[in-house]
Amino acid sequence: MRTSHMLEQLMEALRCLPGVGPKSAQRMAFHLLQRDRKGGLQLADALSHAMTEIGHCNECRTFTEEDVCHICNNPKRQENGLLCVVESPADIAAVEATGQFSGRYFVLMGHLSPLDGIGPSDIGLDVLDYRLRRGDIKEVILATNPTVEGEATAHYIAELCREHKVDASRIAHGVPVGGELELVDGTTLSHSLLGRHKLN
């Protein structure tokens, strides 16, 4: 079936979203045009507004429409000197949802990947270096993903911390709560055994 040029453009634009292939994009486009034109206009307006107004926090690099985000602006978040380093703004949302962290964040917007040409300055490690030099950070909690690249990035940042005499710690990785040992992969189980803690 031949479709209009504008419809093709809409479907192609929808495909920029993660996990959206040609069929999903077609379904979304048809739904908006057939059943929810008002919703489509609201979506277009919200997207346009967000793309022009949302930038990065000057302190932690997360998404915000202000120069400094609400977390970095909160004096109580500065008192304990904790800085949690994450790979993406979505990771901040995940950590915040636990209610267990009361410090500040630094968002890398990725991880080191020499094969892809992504070096330290590409993920803001020069900015992190400057923040460590300021002297208001006592401990850096490395919450990068447990991948080869995430581990390499954590190691690099730990070295930076050592240079500035700032404590560095790594979030624990291991068996999920409610998980069964026989279903856990070997690498995760190894991390669990190595990261065990005493009960008495």
Swiss-Prot record:
Residues annotated as domain Toprim: 81-176
CDD domains, sorted: TOPRIM_recR
UniProt keyword list: DNA damage, DNA recombination, DNA repair, Metal-binding, Zinc, Zinc-finger
Function (record text): May play a role in DNA repair. It seems to be involved in an RecBC-independent recombinational process of DNA repair. It may act with RecF and RecO.
Annotated zinc fingers (C4-type), start-end: 57-72
InterPro entries, A to Z: DNA_Rcmb_RecR, Rcmb_RecR, Rcmb_RecR_Znf, TOPRIM_dom, TOPRIM_RecR
Any GO BP: DNA recombination
The organism of origin for this protein: Vibrio vulnificus (strain YJ016)
Protein name: Recombination protein RecR
Record GO terms (molecular function): DNA binding; zinc ion binding
Pfam families: RecR_C, RecR_HhH, RecR_ZnF, Toprim_4
